[in-house]
From Swiss-Prot:
Annotated coiled-coil segments of the chain: none
Nucleotide-binding listed as a keyword: no
Key words of the record: Ribonucleoprotein, Ribosomal protein
Gene Ontology BP annotations: translation
Chain's gene name: rpmB
Gene3D superfamilies to which the protein is assigned, alphabetical: Ribosomal protein L28/L24
GO molecular function, one term: structural constituent of ribosome
Family: Belongs to the bacterial ribosomal protein bL28 family.
Identification of the protein by name: Large ribosomal subunit protein bL28
Length: 78
């Protein structure tokens, strides 16, 4: 399973660790992904999404029905 948020599309980024002496070593910044089940009232079933915490806030704001409709319009299987 890839580390990509299904709602926002957030992916891992790359950057540097910086020591006290300012030495740079490459590292990855991973999105805060959660596996979460949401109840779709219109379909009387749960959907499982792998979403970031930012994606959860978007679902809280817009509603799960709207977000799932947007995912399906993008061609994502939900």
């Amino acid at each position: 399973m890839s580390r990509v948020c299904q709602v926002t599309g957030k992916k891992p980024m790359v950057g540097n660790n910086r020591s006290h002496a300012k030495n740079a070593t490459r590292r990855r910044f991973l999105p805060n992904l959660q596996n979460h089940r949401f109840w779709l009232e219109g379909e009387k079933r749960f959907v499982k999404l792998r979403i970031s915490t930012k994606g959860m806030r978007i679902i809280d704001k817009k509603g799960i029905e709207v977000v799932v409709a947007e995912l399906r319009a993008r061609g994502e299987k939900v």
